[in-house]
UniProtKB/Swiss-Prot annotation:
Disordered regions undergo liquid-liquid phase separation (LLPS) for the formation of membraneless compartments that store maternal mRNAs in oocytes. Transmembrane segments: none annotated. Expressed in oocytes. This is Protein ZAR1-like 1.L. GO terms for molecular function: mRNA binding; zinc ion binding. It comes from Xenopus laevis.
Length: 281
């Protein structure tokens, strides 16, 4: 009866009957609900999930697609490709190695690769970032160029303005800026209790006899800082293992005295009165 009384289309354009409701722009959908019992007919899921979006959410989706790129339209073939693929192996290494620092693109020898044309179009994704291997500072096989002193420039001028002799320049340039430690035998003398002792595994600067850690007397426990350690060698044959024809008796309980041959000759305290023990710092 309503269709007969009220015409479906207005007589005058732009004018509608005040009592007739405006037809909705989209067909309202019922909320998805679970049937209370088996076999009950329930509403089916729509074939197109985009039909469930209202006008506001649909406008938000179009705005997001427009931000990703102008070539992204509203077609279905683009909706499946919208996403960022994350490689956990690459991204985790970058996060752990760099931390909060930002990536800087170097002009020469850069390890940062830009995205190829057509690859991840519109997403602004770059290719995986590659970093050089970190050089261990405490390794003997590390690159010495990281620890060397400033060298000459292209113009032939030095970075330092002071002038030195050629012999001093060679000595300074050949000297490593980083010093390694090695273990040596140490021979010490305490002036407080007038006791001499010998210690093994003393940390010294590599290539020198300079002691790196403070030593403690085994008798009075007084700590002193010896700057140098005597080299363990025979004073007559200048060898670590004495090759002299006349050798004194070697005590098997104290084998370190065998390397101190000739050390107590002419000294107030003989090697028999020294105390030998080992300790590791």
């Amino acid at each position: 009866m309503a269709g007969l009384v009220y015409p479906q289309y207005p007589v005058f354009p732009g004018y509608r009957h005040p009592y007739r409701q405006h037809p909705p722009l989209y067909k309202p959908k019922q909320q998805y609900w679970k049937p209370p019992y088996k076999g009950a007919p329930g509403p089916l899921k729509p074939t197109n999930p985009l039909d469930c979006l209202d006008g506001y959410k649909w406008a938000q989706l179009k705005a997001l697609l427009s931000q990703l790129g102008p070539e992204f339209g509203l077609g279905r073939r683009f909706t499946k490709e919208v996403g960022v693929q994350v490689n956990p192996r690459v991204d985790a290494c970058i996060q752990c190695s760099l931390g909060p620092r930002t990536l800087k693109n170097c002009k020469a020898g850069s390890f940062l690769f830009h995205a190829a044309p057509g690859q991840h179009a519109g997403l602004g994704i770059i290719a995986p970032v590659r970093f050089p291997l970190t050089v261990a500072v405490y390794s003997r096989l590390s690159d010495r160029r990281l620890f060397t002193l400033p060298t000459f420039t292209n113009g032939g001028k030095k970075e330092c303005e002071t002038q030195m002799d050629p012999a001093e320049e060679d000595l300074v340039l050949n000297r490593p800026a980083f010093q390694f430690l090695e273990q040596k035998y140490g021979f010490f003398h305490c002036k407080n209790c007038q006791t001499r002792w010998e210690s093994a595994y003393v940390w010294c600067v590599s290539g020198t006899n300079k002691v790196y850690f403070k030593q403690f007397c085994h008798k009075c426990q007084k700590g002193h800082n010896p700057y140098y350690v005597e080299s363990i060698e025979c004073k007559r044959c200048k060898k670590a293992w004495c090759s002299c024809p006349e050798r004194r008796h070697i005590d098997l309980k104290r084998p370190h005295c065998q390397e101190l041959c000739g050390r107590c000759k002419g000294q107030r305290l003989s090697c028999d009165k020294t105390y030998s023990f080992k300790y590791i710092i």
